[in-house]
């Protein structure tokens, strides 16, 4: 996959993440200026989990996000297409499953809640992925998508765009084993739909009561929805 290409082959995406797995968590903390911890906590709070819940954390990577969710007392499973990422998180004591977001290895309606953080952009057919998330969620179950989005302030949006295309790749070169992956990250964020468009796509995939909340000035948005 050319680093500038947003035409994603799933195996190439998995290979790209395999290549950055070892230093992935450190790189994310550095490049987000420590905001990644806040975003994970906000995702857990948005899910409103109880100890009886069964939760799918999709595109969980090294399972840092899954451990955060499990802090609620809910039973949580980490799923990711990158075996390398799951292996990098092997020490984290949560169940882990390798799987494709568009063909999940779970029965219908088995989860009370499904979440995906910073992974929907990397799903080849994200509409199919959203439908598959609905399939494995029980009626009345919840979805929370935590994803990069569009800053709401125009001046801030301009500064952020400069950071994405100039500073972020330079910083990634210093801390990541594969800085080209972060050029792809920047370009995929720029190409991603804004808050309202993503909400429409989530609704079109069969979810109801779709709403969103901006974090960090709209750099990230939490989209929540319910399965009818």
UniProtKB/Swiss-Prot annotation:
Family assignment? Belongs to the class I-like SAM-binding methyltransferase superfamily. MenG/UbiE family.
Alphabetic keyword roster: Menaquinone biosynthesis, Methyltransferase, S-adenosyl-L-methionine, Transferase
The record ties this protein, via HAMAP family, to: MenG_UbiE_methyltr
Q: Quote any Pfam family the record assigns.
A: Ubie_methyltran
- Which superkingdom does the taxonomy of this entry point to? Bacteria
EC number, UniProt record = 2.1.1.163
Pathway assigned in UniProt = Quinol/quinone metabolism; menaquinone biosynthesis; menaquinol from 1,4-dihydroxy-2-naphthoate: step 2/2
For this protein, the record's CDD domains field holds: AdoMet_MTases
Q: What is this protein called?
A: Demethylmenaquinone methyltransferase
Which Gene3D superfamilies does this UniProt record tie to the protein?
A: Vaccinia Virus protein VP39 (3.40.50.150)
**What is the role of the protein in this entry?**
Methyltransferase required for the conversion of demethylmenaquinol (DMKH2) to menaquinol (MKH2).
